[in-house]
């Protein structure tokens, strides 16, 4: 909300920040009143709000998470998922798809395994259709995963009672582990999901959709294992 942005800006200034940067991604890009929202944010926090494009968001996440060399990046957000391929600082390709965890959950809530399997297949078709350019690259990069779905998966895999994204930095997840969590979560009730160590209660409804997106992406891009990163577009923006 506008008030939340104002509070964050005020807190940053109270902590001594000399310059405040504010940028908006998928939710504001898609909102009918996105421009009105950013204008109100600018008025309350006293700094310009930049609405970044989907491709720009993909590049920012890559810059934030890449550690150099040939790198593929998957950033699963609420409204969209970004894919980027690069070598060091050179971007080979970047794309943003309209299939975030919140968006996919709104289209088809995952209440049983059949819902999960259908979501995986839907996401695979979307990737085949909208990320053809990236799928055509023959490079074999190290893959890195960014966003709440990734770090939540890491926290659940390690059974960390109090979720902290930084504790998952550098952790790796393979495809069987991702697919296994997808199957287990899909078969759980909402109450059971809320009891899983590492899964914050407010993510209990959307996390299976995020995992379905990740499984679909790993299968389409031929990813057997990826490294988790707590860094993403905010880090990339500051760089």
Q: What do the predicted segments below correspond to?
A:
Residues 1-19, 25-70, 85-239:
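Helical "lid/coupling" subdomains associated with nucleotide-phosphate turnover
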Residues 79-85:
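Acidic, divalent-metal-coordinating active-site segment for phosphoryl/phosphodiester hydrolysis
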Residues 75:
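Conserved catalytic-loop position in the HRD/HxD motif
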């Amino acid at each position: 909300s506008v008030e939340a942005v104002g509070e964050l800006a005020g807190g940053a200034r109270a902590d001594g920040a000399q310059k405040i940067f504010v940028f908006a991604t998928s939710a504001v890009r898609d909102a009918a009143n996105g421009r009105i929202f950013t204008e109100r944010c600018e008025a309350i926090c006293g700094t310009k709000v930049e609405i970044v494009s989907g491709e720009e968001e993909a590049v920012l996440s890559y810059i934030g998470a890449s550690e150099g060399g040939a790198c593929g990046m998957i950033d699963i957000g609420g409204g969209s998922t970004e894919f980027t391929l690069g070598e060091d600082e050179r971007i080979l390709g970047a794309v943003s798809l309209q299939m975030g965890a919140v968006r996919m959950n709104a289209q088809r809530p995952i209440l049983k395994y059949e819902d999960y399997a259908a979501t995986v297949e839907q996401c695979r078709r979307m990737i085949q259709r909208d990320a053809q350019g990236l799928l055509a690259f023959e490079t074999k990069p190290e893959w890195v995963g960014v966003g709440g779905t990734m770090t939540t998966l890491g926290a659940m895999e390690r059974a960390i009672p109090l979720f902290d994204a930084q504790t998952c930095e550098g952790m790796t997840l393979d495809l069987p582990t991702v697919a296994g969590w997808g199957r287990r979560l899909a078969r759980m009730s909402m109450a059971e999901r809320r009891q899983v160590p590492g899964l914050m209660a407010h993510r209990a409804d959307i996390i299976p959709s995020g995992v379905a997106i990740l499984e679909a992406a790993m299968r389409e891009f031929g990813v057997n294992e990826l490294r988790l990163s707590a860094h993403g577009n905010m880090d990339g923006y500051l760089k």
